[in-house]
C-alpha cells in the first residue's frame, strides 16, 4: 500500500466519497482514540498511547479514512526477525467490506519489507471474525493465554525462509 491510496472495495456506505488508506497524522488522534473505544471498549488504548505510536518513527500507523472520518486503523512495529501487529481496528459499520483484509495485507507487506520472518498478533478468543480473517491469511494459533480475565490467542504467520509462504 502506498502512503496514500484510494480504497475501493464497497467503500461508499453513506456517500460517494472514497475512503483513502494513508499514514496516520497527529490530527487523527481524536478519531483514533474514538475508533479504539468503539472497537475495544474497556481495553482501548489511552490517548497518550495513541500519541506515542503516531508520533514515534519506529511505529507504523495506517488509517483508512473517508474525509476526516477514520474508519479503520492498524498499528505495526516492523522489525526483524518478528514484526508485531499491535492493533487492527475496523469500525463496526465498515466490517466485512475488505477493510480489515486490506490493512492485514499491508501489515504483511511492511513486515516483509522489514525482513521479518514472522508476523505476530493477538486476538480475543471470542472474536471469530478476526480469527477467521487471520486464518484465511495464513496465521495459526501459537499460544492461548488469559489476560485481564479474557482468553486471547497469539497468532503468527511465517513470512519467508525455507518453509515460508
Report residues per predicted region.
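Structural motif
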Residues: 114, 132, 136-137
Amino acid at each position: 500500500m502506498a502512503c496514500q491510496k484510494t480504497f475501493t472495495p464497497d467503500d461508499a456506505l453513506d456517500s460517494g466519497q472514497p475512503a483513502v488508506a494513508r499514514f496516520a497524522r497527529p490530527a487523527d488522534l481524536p478519531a483514533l482514540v474514538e475508533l479504539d473505544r468503539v472497537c475495544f471498549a474497556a481495553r482501548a488504548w489511552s490517548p497518550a498511547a495513541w500519541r506515542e505510536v503516531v508520533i514515534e518513527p519506529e511505529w507504523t500507523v495506517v488509517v483508512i479514512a473517508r474525509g476526516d472520518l477514520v474508519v479503520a486503523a492498524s498499528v505495526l512495529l516492523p522489525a526483524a526477525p518478528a514484526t508485531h501487529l499491535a492493533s487492527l481496528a475496523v469500525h463496526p459499520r465498515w466490517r466485512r467490506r475488505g477493510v480489515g483484509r486490506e490493512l492485514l495485507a499491508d501489515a504483511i507487506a511492511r513486515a516483509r519489507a522489514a525482513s521479518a520472518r514472522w508476523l505476530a498478533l493477538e486476538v480475543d478468543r471470542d472474536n471469530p471474525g478476526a480469527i477467521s480473517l487471520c486464518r484465511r491469511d495464513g496465521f495459526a494459533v501459537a499460544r492461548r493465554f488469559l489476560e485481564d480475565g479474557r482468553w486471547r490467542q497469539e497468532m503468527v504467520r511465517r513470512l519467508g525462509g525455507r518453509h515460508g509462504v
